[in-house]
Amino acid sequence: MQRRRSNIEIIGDMLRIGANGAGKTEIMYSANMSYSQLQKYLSMLISQGFIDRLELGNPMVTYRVTERGSTLLRSIDTILDVLEFKSNSF
């Protein structure tokens, strides 16, 4: 049985997927999350300035990681690397 992902892992996945721009459906399926989870996390990431919502035409909307989001992703990756190393030490 797989363990549940932490919030930080989900956020990291979303930021990785949105690095080059992605729509809601692509983010949702690639990050393996429900629509309600997507809405919750996407709303938070947009409001905090980690992801921008870009309207490229009607009805096309793309979500792209900001510079601040890229900085957060690097920090998340560092933290996850350290935690993975420590969890493998047992």
Task: Walk through the language-model features, giving the residues of each.
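A short acidic, leucine-rich amphipathic alpha-helix
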Residues: 26-31
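Amphipathic alpha-helical dimerization/coiled-coil segments
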Residues: 75-90
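Short capping segments at the starts of secondary-structure elements
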Residues: 18-23
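Short amphipathic alpha-helical interaction segments
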Residues: 33-47
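Basic, amphipathic "hinge/linker" alpha-helix immediately C-terminal to the N-terminal HTH DNA-binding motif
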Residues: 58-76
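Short alpha-helical segments that sit at the start of domains
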Residues: 1-12
